C-alpha cells in the first residue's frame, strides 16, 4: 500500500 493513501492498495 501507499504511505499516505489507503486506497492506493
Curated annotation (Swiss-Prot):
It comes from the Eukaryota. One of its GO terms (cellular component) is extracellular region. Contains 2 disulfide bonds that can be either 'C1-C3, C2-C4' or 'C1-C4, C2-C3', since these disulfide connectivities have been observed for conotoxins with cysteine framework V (for examples, see AC P0DQQ7 and AC P81755). It is found in: Secreted. The modification Cysteine amide is found at residue 9. Keywords: Amidation, Disulfide bond, Ion channel impairing toxin, Secreted, Toxin. Expressed by the venom duct. Probable toxin that inhibits ion channels. The cysteine framework is V (CC-CC). This is Conotoxin Am1099. It comes from Conus amadis.
Amino acid at each position: 500500500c501507499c504511505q499516505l493513501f489507503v486506497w492506493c492498495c
